[in-house]
């Protein structure tokens, strides 16, 4: 989950992992973020993304999910030992001054880099199965486009 640029990165993460068979949701809406805490269990892995490390809804989800036994990971530019009270892991990303305002470098850049590393590492586990799933999602899209008579869309899936 995440808000703003962090939320957009979460949506990108959902799209990529969903295509290789991971049951994943990205949450960008404050109310949905809070409601989803109820469904977290010890079987859950919850990622929160907040460049500032201070987005209250993201921290709420991580805190409450942790209380329910879920593994929790925060991706942030903030270093604060107290985050480990409710985060199984804290992945610190580089931050430039004013990065969260997106004037010079997209705030998503360091987040997407970390997500690419996580995705690549996960994808290496049983790579053949994941490549097959990815291919099957491409085929499902192509079949849908063929049925509707639409030309294939240019997406970077």
Task: Give, region by region, the residue ranges found by the protein language model.
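A short, charged, Gly/Pro-tolerant segment at domain boundaries
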Residues: 128-157
